[in-house]
Amino acid sequence: YAWVRWYEGVYGWSAGLDSFAPEFETYWMNFLYIELVLEVTTAAILWGYIWKTRDRNVMSITPREELRRHFTHWTWLVMYGIAIYFGASYFTEQDGTWHQTIVRDTDFTPSHIIEFYLSYPIYIITGGASFLYAKTRLPAYQDGLSLQYLVSVVGPFMILPNVGLNEWGHTFWFMEELFVAPLHYGFVFFGWAALGVLGVINIEVEALSKLLKKDLV
């Protein structure tokens, strides 16, 4: 994230103000193409690996192994929380200030290339990996699908399809960039769905409390 913010700061002003300039293609459209390929590849490899190496006897693991997996799962949850912050908060708010300062001449502005097509996929990939890890390796998540988990992962994921509606609206209505515009309500609604992770934490606390009553052998 630090490198991305540095890149945006350096090349956003020098090469990102005119989408018809050759330097925009060099520094920003190529950035977009590369990140999309890397994201699809990373998601396929990471999710595929977690699923391929799933534990087929997850209900038979020892309490000690289950505790270890819960700590690994917590690591995934923390990573997801960090990714959600940078995607749905930091870079999203930054995008608002960009549009209040610069007149857009393309949907693929430097701030959009980083916000919509980099920071959002990062938290989607991380959230999906966290969900798959819990589903394939922890007994607490074996009975059906956790509604709390689905809300906390699918909700923020739906921000990405909402981007299409948002860009269409801005193009069709030539709207002023206002945070309170009805067109932005979807970002707020789906963004707050991330609070479903509190329900996941509740499941974790319950599972850990049961484990602590056992001999960890």
Where are these regions (language model features)?
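C-terminal transmembrane-bundle signature of multipass membrane proteins
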Residues: 2, 146-217
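Interfacial helix-start motif at the membrane-water boundary
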Residues: 25-45, 72-78
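Generic alpha-helical transmembrane segments
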Residues: 36-48, 113-132, 192-196
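Membrane-proximal helix-loop-helix units in multi-pass membrane proteins
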Residues: 78-144
